[in-house]
Amino acid sequence: MNLLLTNDDGYGSEGLSALAQKLSQKHNVFIIAPDGNRSAISHGITMYKKNRVKLVEKNVWTCSGTPVDCVITALKSNILPIRPDGILSGINKGANLGTDIVYSGTCAAAREGVIEGIPSVAFSLEYVDNKLEYFDVLADFASKNIEKLLMCSDVQKEKTFVNVNAFSYPKYKGIR
């Protein structure tokens, strides 16, 4: 699959790196992420000025705008060689549940993907004992289940993205 990855924690975040590392083993991965932290920016888009996009390495770009700007830029410009089959946002530092979803740039990027007609999933990792570890465990879960998760994203009728939240544990017993 051709997958576009982004987030709201910024290009250098541990969650994005873990997700990219796992998914690139089986899929074509393209990354465009904010050049800095844009947490809680919601569905903001940049108006009245151009976003700066910088190629960091092959198939990896930073953008001076918001997570939604990243998705729009990737889809509306000519930087991607192909339209992605799915958009993945995260892995976010901290959960995105309840009203958090309204403020979350992570969720907004996935929402924008669905608006553009592409199945999308947001991933978030919740702190345990004030620690945030094990991004690789959630990234591994994402890699093993990405096809199923993207099938649950309804881009036609309901216009919904999938929002995955997990505790920062060294392993998972299952899902619900």
Regions found by a protein language model. Name each.
Residues 36, 127, 166-170:
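Glycine-rich beta-alpha junction loops
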Residues 30-32, 61, 88, 119-123, ...:
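Hydrophobic/aromatic beta-strand patches that form the interior of the parallel beta-sheet core
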Residues 135-176:
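Electrostatically charged, flexible surface regions
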Residues 9:
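Active-site metal-binding loops of divalent metal-dependent hydrolases
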Residues 114-137:
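Glycine-rich phosphate/pyrophosphate-binding loops
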Residues 109-113:
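Hydrophobic/aromatic ligand-binding patch that stacks against planar heteroaromatic rings
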Residues 95-104:
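Glycine/threonine-rich flexible loop motifs
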Residues 3, 13-77, 81-83:
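A cross-family phosphate/adenosyl-ligand binding-site feature
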